[in-house]
Curated annotation (Swiss-Prot):
One GO cellular component term: interleukin-6 receptor complex
Function: Cytokine with a wide variety of biological functions in immunity, tissue regeneration, and metabolism. Binds to IL6R, then the complex associates to the signaling subunit IL6ST/gp130 to trigger the intracellular IL6-signaling pathway. The interaction with the membrane-bound IL6R and IL6ST stimulates 'classic signaling', whereas the binding of IL6 and soluble IL6R to IL6ST stimulates 'trans-signaling'. Alternatively, 'cluster signaling' occurs when membrane-bound IL6:IL6R complexes on transmitter cells activate IL6ST receptors on neighboring receiver cells.
Record keywords: Acute phase, Cytokine, Disulfide bond, Growth factor, Phosphoprotein, Secreted, Signal
Disulphide connectivity of cysteines: 71-77, 100-110
Cross-referenced Gene3D superfamilies: 1.20.1250.10
Signal peptide: 1-29
Lineage summary: Eukaryota, Metazoa, Chordata, Craniata, Vertebrata
Subunit relationships: Component of a hexamer of two molecules each of IL6, IL6R and IL6ST; first binds to IL6R to associate with the signaling subunit IL6ST. Interacts with IL6R (via the N-terminal ectodomain); this interaction may be affected by IL6R-binding with SORL1, hence decreasing IL6 cis signaling. Interacts with SORL1 (via the N-terminal ectodomain); this interaction leads to IL6 internalization and lysosomal degradation. May form a trimeric complex with the soluble SORL1 ectodomain and soluble IL6R receptor; this interaction might stabilize circulating IL6, hence promoting IL6 trans signaling.
Family under the similarity heading: Belongs to the IL-6 superfamily.
Gene Ontology molecular function: any one: interleukin-6 receptor binding
InterPro entries, sorted: 4_helix_cytokine-like_core (IPR009079), IL-6-like (IPR003574), IL-6/GCSF/MGF (IPR030474), IL6/GCSF/MGF_CS (IPR030473)
Organism: Camelus bactrianus (Bactrian camel)
The protein's name: Interleukin-6
Length: 211
């Protein structure tokens, strides 16, 4: 199969298939929470930009479905006043200094930023996995696919040992804080997380296309 087209598969089925692809594509996988201890890259497979692009498109499709579902179920739509304020969330964003924009584009800097940003999103995806009340297949697919995308992009970073992982203590503290909020606020946070991840991936998609 040369495409990540999912028209014939459910989100869960695709996620399981993605795990099989990951198992064959990465014979010696490195856990996301561990830094690379060996700087050599000759034995790591190179992944074409097309695969990363298709995977990003797939994730964006799942996010779109989740946002639509929340809009219909909770009236948490894109133009809702609550979703215009990011409250106390410190969600990853893309800026000019990250080297991902066409002006001032820097492939290595951009790859590092996308990879680290997606790692930072993991704690928020855990939150979605715990509290999203819609189609759980979509939340699972987004989380698994995002981890797969991180692995794909790490193959292209020249110095993967410099890809820092978020502090687990900080992440745990943030997750505990989010969990103490009422359901209305949780729903607002979830739509903010989805919107921010979507924006981040849209910038990432444009950057991957010119790499």
């Amino acid at each position: 199969m040369n495409s990540l087209s999912t028209s014939a598969f459910s989100p869960v089925a695709f996620s399981l298939g993605l795990l099989l692809v990951m198992a064959t594509a990465f014979p010696t996988p490195v856990p996301l929470g561990e830094d690379f201890k060996d700087g050599t890259t000759s034995n790591r497979p190179f992944t074409s930009p097309d695969k990363s692009e298709e995977l990003i498109k797939y994730i964006l499709g799942r996010i779109s479905a989740m946002r639509k579902e929340m809009c219909e179920k909770y009236d948490k739509c894109e133009n809702s006043k609550e979703a215009l304020s990011e409250n106390n969330l410190n969600l990853p964003k893309m800026t000019e200094k990250d080297g991902c924009f066409q002006s001032g584009f820097n492939q290595e800097t951009c790859l590092m930023r996308i990879t680290i940003g997606l790692l930072e999103f993991q704690i928020y995806l855990d939150y979605l996995q715990n509290y999203y009340e819609g189609d759980k297949g979509n939340t699972e697919a987004v989380q698994i696919s995002t981890k797969a995308l991180i692995q794909l992009l790490r193959q292209k970073v020249k110095q993967p040992e410099e890809v820092s992982t978020p502090n687990p203590i900080t992440g745990s503290s943030l997750l505990n804080k989010l969990q103490t909020e009422n359901q209305w606020m949780k729903n607002t946070k979830m739509i903010l997380i989805l919107r921010s991840l979507e924006d981040f991936l849209q910038f990432s998609l444009r950057a991957v296309r010119i790499m």
